[in-house]
């Protein structure tokens, strides 16, 4: 796989992941330099449709040196038209959300975003998930002895 830049750990706790996709992301030069310096955070970010295009909202990319820009500006995600259509249809019909899971460098040194179609978990679902994880850990410990 490619080199991981950042991961949105909050998504794995708060959502049920239904489908994953790889998307390109439109960046300016200073944003790429900030990403190389690991000054990026996906916590609290999400994706929305604007005029049949998908945008990444509320992702933080720090300012590089003395550049004047917006750290939390919306960034366009690049997907094929059929992928966009399918995603939009699922979001509207099944009331799902789209969130970024991670940013990484691909083999051609391009920044890619891994996005996911997700459904929010309720509080009791999160508790059940934690209980299952704890019991699995205990079972693994018992098996290893």
UniProtKB/Swiss-Prot annotation:
Query: What's a Gene Ontology MF term here?
Result: RNA binding
Q: Where in the cell is the protein located? A: Cytoplasm
Q: Which GO terms describe its cellular component?
A: cytosol
SUPFAM superfamilies membership: Small protein B (SmpB)
An annotated GO BP:
trans-translation
Superkingdom, natural source:
Bacteria
Checking Pfam families in the record gives:
SmpB (PF01668)
What keywords are annotated for this sequence in UniProt? Cytoplasm, RNA-binding
Protein purpose: Required for rescue of stalled ribosomes mediated by trans-translation. Binds to transfer-messenger RNA (tmRNA), required for stable association of tmRNA with ribosomes. tmRNA and SmpB together mimic tRNA shape, replacing the anticodon stem-loop with SmpB. tmRNA is encoded by the ssrA gene; the 2 termini fold to resemble tRNA(Ala) and it encodes a 'tag peptide', a short internal open reading frame. During trans-translation Ala-aminoacylated tmRNA acts like a tRNA, entering the A-site of stalled ribosomes, displacing the stalled mRNA.
Please name the NCBIfam families in this protein's record: PRK05422.1, smpB
Similarity section: Belongs to the SmpB family.
- Write the protein's name: SsrA-binding protein
- Species: Mycoplasmopsis pulmonis (strain UAB CTIP) (Mycoplasma pulmonis)
């Amino acid at each position: 796989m490619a080199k991981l830049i950042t991961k949105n750990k909050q998504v794995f706790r708060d959502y049920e992941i239904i489908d994953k996709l790889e998307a390109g992301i439109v960046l300016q030069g200073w944003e790429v330099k900030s990403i190389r310096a690991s000054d990026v955070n996906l916590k609290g970010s999400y994706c929305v449709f604007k005029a049949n295009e998908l945008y990444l909202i509320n992702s933080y990319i720090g300012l590089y040196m003395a550049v004047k820009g917006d750290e939390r500006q919306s960034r366009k995600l690049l997907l094929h038209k059929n992928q966009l259509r399918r995603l939009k249809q699922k979001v509207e019909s099944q009331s799902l959300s789209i969130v970024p899971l991670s940013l990484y460098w691909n083999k051609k040194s391009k920044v890619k975003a891994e996005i996911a179609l997700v459904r929010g978990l309720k509080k009791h679902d999160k508790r059940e998930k934690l209980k299952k994880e704890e019991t699995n850990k205990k079972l693994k410990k018992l098996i290893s002895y």
